[in-house]
Amino acid sequence: MFKFVIYLFTFIAFANANYTTWSLVTDYTTYCPQSTEITVNNSIITITGPTTLTITGECTLDYVATVEAAPSSIPSNVTVIESNGASKLNLRSLAGAGLVAAIFIAFI
């Protein structure tokens, strides 16, 4: 069972996620160095080249952020010991247990 949990933590640590959020602003100015698309008030504005975009008045901006988890491995103070066909988890310190719990909580 513990081997599965550790493998699950490793799998979760490599997972990427996209999050969409929005901001309500009164005015918006941005410089776009290349072609891109910006969503403003649920409408897509297409930028075809380098330009400064200015929007006056209240508007809602959508942002899609890709959160990429840093590759991780099993912490050095956590080992899996195989004995008599049973898996045992040996935590050398409480810090190891805290780190594993923090990794689990961070990705829920």
From Swiss-Prot:
Residue ranges annotated as propeptide in the record: 85-108
Lipidation residue positions, type GPI-anchor amidated asparagine: N84
Protein location: Secreted, Cell wall; Membrane
Membrane-topology annotation of the record: Lipid-anchor; GPI-anchor
GO cellular component: extracellular region; side of membrane
PTM comment text: The GPI-anchor is attached to the protein in the endoplasmic reticulum and serves to target the protein to the cell surface. There, the glucosamine-inositol phospholipid moiety is cleaved off and the GPI-modified mannoprotein is covalently attached via its lipidless GPI glycan remnant to the 1,6-beta-glucan of the outer cell wall layer.
Source taxon at top rank: Eukaryota
Keyword Cytoplasm: no
Induction entry: Expression is induced in high iron conditions.
Annotated glycan sites: N18, N41, N77
Keywords of this entry: Cell wall, Glycoprotein, GPI-anchor, Lipoprotein, Membrane, Secreted, Signal
Signal peptide positions on this chain: 1-17
Similarity comment: Belongs to the SED1 family.
Physiological role: Cell wall protein that plays a role in adaptation and resistance to cell wall stress.
Name the record gives this protein: Cell wall protein PGA48
Species classification: Eukaryota, Fungi, Dikarya, Ascomycota, Saccharomycotina
Gene name of this polypeptide: PGA48
